[in-house]
Amino acid sequence: MAIGDRKKIIIDTDPGIDDAMAIFVALNSPEVDVIGLTTIFGNVYTTLATRNALHLLEVAGRTDIPVAEGTHKTFLNDTKLRIADFVHGKDGLGNQNFPPPKGKPIEKSGPEFLVEQAKLCPGEITVVALGPLTNLALAVQLDPEFSKNVGQIVLLGGAFAVNGNVNPASEANIFGDPEAADIVFTCGADIIAVGINVTHQVIMTADDKDKLASSKGKLAQYLCKILDVYYDYHLTAYEIKGVYLHDPATILAAFLPSLFTYTEGVARVQTSGITRGLTLLYNNLKRFEEANEWSDKPTVKVAVTVDAPAVVKLIMDRLMES
């Protein structure tokens, strides 16, 4: 595939074991050109997310890709953050305690980098957001034209018509900064939301892990070092002998959207009470008599089904070919 035909993507990430997998899949996919990583809190604090992003690029031999460190606080400047290190390990990468990366982040912040790149290539950049949506909300605040300049936002977030994974109401990325999520969902950009209603169908089994281990793929071998913590968490939390491929599935939605089907509607996020972080999609099937919080807001696409076997096979193939 010619360089000019490849989709330019920026990955907004909180690495994270499945983030590592998603980044590696993207780097080993000829359909995309990864032009940068921006970092955010979520699976780890932002400082560690930056370190991990730089480390993963070194592992992949792609230190040419810039890393822009994102915000350390929520959109409302809260520094009390929910960190999912119990899922990914204290270091975010399976408690392997890898040596520090040699590289450094660029001077621009994550939101500044997003705004800059969207301005440089209007309509051409896809941002794949794998963590809380704070950097994107700050980009919207920083530049009112960002929503028009960015080509598409493909995000992992929401639990549409299913229970959440933080509590019965909320999915982790949306719960991490509900105010930011609501800003992004209603900003008017071209958005695809991939929620856990879909990603919980995409499972890498223990047998799949064995296939990775027996392959000659360099990145597959690396992942096998860090996956045990992730498998242990899923066995304890969900009683399954496998792991959900949230982030890698979302990466694929950015450049192979036909692997999913979608519905379209207005998505809003609850920002208070016991359902804080709840995502509610209005499907436009009823015309309400009174105006409400969904009225006259831009629509987004939400993934509703997935060809899970095809997604898992593609992820495995890209990793084993690495």
UniProtKB/Swiss-Prot annotation:
It catalyses: uridine + H2O = D-ribose + uracil; inosine + H2O = hypoxanthine + D-ribose; xanthosine + H2O = D-ribose + xanthine. Expressed in roots, seedlings and flowers. The keyword Zinc does not apply. One of its GO terms (molecular function) is purine nucleosidase activity. The active site is at residues 14, 246. Gene3D superfamilies: Ribonucleoside hydrolase-like (3.90.245.10). One of its GO terms (cellular component) is cytosol. InterPro entries: Inosine/uridine_hydrolase_dom, IUNH, Ribo_hydro-like. The keyword Hydrolase applies. One of its GO terms (biological process) is inosine catabolic process. It is an enzyme of class 3 (hydrolase). Disulfide bonds: none annotated. Keywords: Cytoplasm, Glycosidase, Hydrolase. Induction: Accumulates during senescence. Its EC number is 3.2.2.3, 3.2.2.2, 3.2.2.-. Disruption phenotype: Normal seedling germination and plant growth and development in standard conditions. No abnormal levels of nucleoside intermediates. The roots of the double mutant urh1 urh2 accumulates strong levels of xanthosine. It is found in: Cytoplasm, Cytosol. Component of the NSH heterocomplex made of URH1/NSH1 and URH2/NSH2 which exhibits strong xanthosine nucleosidase activity. Interacts with URH1. Involved in pyrimidine breakdown, especially in response to dark stress. In the presence of URH1, exhibits efficient inosine and xanthosine hydrolytic activities. Support inosine breakdown especially during the late phase of senescence. Belongs to the IUNH family. This is Probable uridine nucleosidase 2. It comes from Arabidopsis thaliana (Mouse-ear cress).
